[in-house]
A protein has these predicted regions:
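Carbohydrate-binding surface patches
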Residues: 14-16, 524-560
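Surface-exposed beta-strand/loop patches in extracellular or lumenal glycoproteins
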Residues: 26-32, 38, 549-563
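Conserved, mostly hydrophobic/aromatic
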Residues: 29, 135, 196, 206, ...
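C-terminal beta-strand-rich structural cap/linker in extracellular carbohydrate-active enzymes
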Residues: 31-33, 131, 570-601
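Substrate-binding/active-site clefts of carbohydrate-active enzymes
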Residues: 136-203, 209-326, 346-353, 369-370, ...
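Aromatic/acidic polysaccharide-binding cleft in carbohydrate-active enzymes
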Residues: 138, 372-374, 378-387, 429, ...
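Active-site-proximal helices and loops of the catalytic beta/alpha 8
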Residues: 240-249, 258, 263-273, 319, ...
Length: 601
């Protein structure tokens, strides 16, 4: 018996991908032999399995059923087939782009996922169509006239030159003895806006800028003050004004899960149980034993269910309101998966009231099926986050460029397919793609120092759905291992012009081709080390093809295997790539106008 289902093929499932609550979904299964019955098993998380009999349609020669999905949430499904009084399970095939396979093993059936949301998240054109640049403020640029460092912190360590390699200064117990600084500041960022604009950047995302002891500033001392080493509120206003004058935007980092142990909030809580801040924290043994972030005692965790704290962050005179009123354009939320859903909704609500629509959460996994303490987190419902940092995209890009065989490459492509299928379209297009951040090794280091591979990684990031985000210095060829080595100073005057020009070209291509922003997605497998990512809409097809081998290659349509592409689009892509020469360790972007193709038929 052969049974066929493919969640990417409209013959078998309509509509494709994530759906809005209230949508009717049609499932169809083709079976080449007579069977007794076919059943769709559909499960919503935390609810009982539901069985839906499928009816044979003599016209389509398929077993079919249509079901209205009334409420948002996370659903899983598979099919049960009865033949000769034996049961078969039609499950998701591994790394096969939505295809299904039969099994009689009922112990671990691989299900298909169905994401259901209440409403699509808003898409700000400046963001969805743009290019973001992440800056770790202390390590980017010092804009003071003579490079002097202002607002120096007591007992801190200042490096002699920007070329120095950062390291942590710890005591015999492994605790930080001194925090180290290079002296980058807000004026320095403002000074480099022309560089960023030339690169093609349209928005910058800053790691935390509020008052703190450390160089990373995830240990907030005071949410209402700019860190003196970075500058003043006036410096921030000047940066925002300069960005807006250049049609660029600003995203700030909100760290609302924990504060610094030397913050005004925690210090007052430890000094007085009658303090307004005492209830913000969970003391195990007052005052020296308390709940902290992952056991890091310098980062006491805040009780996010505390109404006073929530109001301090999200109230009309709170932290978000204060800074967003200065025309901040969006927020990234640190460790969003540790913030309660009601807190995330309160954050979103406050920002909407301040006319700010962008709330990006730090979530490292596929955010469509994220669980925290066995509780499902409905990030895609439409009422909390509007996107997440796309670390799965980083992982699959690296896997594509390091795969030892074609099976590894197909697996990486399939990982992208899962994101496209699991995420609502607008949510995916709002995700912040990256190939490196302050929490990862530098992409050039990961790829063995090979700048041609780094260029291909940039190309994949720009060609994939989501907003490309460049980690400062990656485009300059900066290297770095794990934290703190990945936080070196920007190498002004020693940049890789090859990578800078690559990024600038990709930014121009993304701006010129709407398919790279909101087009559908498909893949082409040619041979080991040579693959293509396809984006298309009703007007154009854009193909990003890379060759990571050490040979120039004449592309041959007969070698091309396409995935997740309608037959007509697949044929056009083959025509577009056929007989093209792709140089070794290089990539190419090819475009075809759909209207011209239609007229030429």
């Amino acid at each position: 018996m052969k049974a066929t289902f493919n969640s990417w093929d409209g013959k078998y499932r309509q509509p494709f991908g994530a759906i809005q609550a209230g949508t009717s979904v049609k499932w169809s299964v083709a079976i080449d032999e007579e069977v007794q019955e076919v059943t769709l098993w559909l499960t919503k998380i935390n609810e009982d399995d539901m069985a839906y009999p499928m009816t044979y349609n003599s016209e389509t020669k398929m077993y079919e059923t249509s079901i209205r999905i009334g409420t948002s949430g996370l659903y899983y499904y598979y099919f049960n087939i009865k033949q000769n009084n034996q049961y078969y399970f039609l499950q998701r095939a591994r790394d096969q782009f939505g295809e299904a396979e039969l099994t009689q093993d009922s112990t671990d059936v691989r299900t298909f996922q169905l994401t259901c949301y209440d409403r699509q998240v808003p898409q700000e054109p400046w963001y969805a169509q743009g290019v973001v640049y992440q800056i770790f403020p202390d390590r980017f640029n010092n804009g003071n006239p003579h490079g002097e460092i202002t607002g120096r912190k007591k007992n801190s360590f200042l490096y002699a030159t920007p070329e120095d390699t950062p390291y942590y200064i710890k005591d015999e117990h492994g605790a930080m003895a001194r925090w180290d600084f290079f002296g980058g500041n807000l004026k320095g960022i403002t000074e480099k806006v022309p560089y960023l604009k030339k690169l093609g950047v349209t928005a910058i995302y800053l790691n935390p800028i509020f008052m703190a002891s450390s160089n990373h500033r995830y240990d907030t001392q005071d949410f209402m003050k700019i860190d003196p080493m970075l500058g003043t509120e006036q410096d921030l206003q000047e940066l925002i004004q300069t960005l807006h004058d250049n049609k660029m935007h600003l995203i700030l980092d909100g760290v609302f899960n924990h504060v610094g142990a030397d913050s005004k909030y925690f210090l007052k809580a430890t000094q007085d149980k009658n303090s307004d801040y005492f209830s913000w924290f969970n003391f195990i043994h007052y005052p020296d034993k308390y709940q902290s972030w992952w056991g890091v005692t310098t980062l006491p965790e805040v009780n996010k269910h505390n109404k006073q704290y929530v109001n301090y962050i999200t109230g009309p005179k709170g932290v978000l309101a204060k800074w967003t009123k200065m025309q901040v354009d969006g927020w990234r939320l640190d460790v969003a998966d540790e913030l309660p859903m009601e807190f995330l909704r309160a954050i979103r609500d406050r920002l909407q009231k301040e006319n700010c629509q962008l709330v990006i959460g730090e979530v490292w996994e596929d955010a469509s099926h994220k669980f925290v303490n066995s509780e499902f987190r409905p990030y895609m419902a439409g009422d909390n986050l509007t996107g997440v940092m796309n670390y799965p995209m980083r992982n699959l890009i690296i896997n594509l460029l390091q795969a030892k065989d074609e099976a590894g490459e197909i697996s990486a492509m399939n990982d992208l397919e899962k994101l496209v299928e699991n995420y609502p379209k607008a949510f995916l297009e709002n995700c912040l793609n990256n190939i490196g951040t302050h929490d990862t090794e530098r992409i050039k280091t990961v790829l063995g120092g090979d700048e041609e591979l780094v260029a291909m990684a940039f190309g994949l990031m720009f060609a994939a759905p989501g907003v490309p985000c460049i980690y400062y210095g990656d485009e300059a060829g900066l290297i770095g291992g794990k934290d703190p080595d990945n936080r070196r100073c920007f190498p002004w005057g020693k940049e890789s012009h090859f990578l800078e020009e690559t990024v600038s070209m990709l930014a121009r291509a993304r701006k010129a081709n709407p398919a790279l922003v909101s087009g559908k997605v498909g893949f082409v497998k040619i041979r080991l080390g040579i693959n293509a990512l396809v984006r298309y809409n009703d007007r154009e097809i854009v193909v990003y093809c890379y060759n990571r081998t050490n040979e120039d290659v004449d592309l041959d349509a007969s070698e091309m295997r396409t995935y997740c592409l309608p037959e007509m689009i697949a044929d056009l892509v083959r025509d577009l790539l056929d007989q093209e020469v792709i140089a070794k360790k290089d990539f190419l972007l090819k475009k075809a106008d759909m209207m011209e193709k239609e007229e030429s038929k």
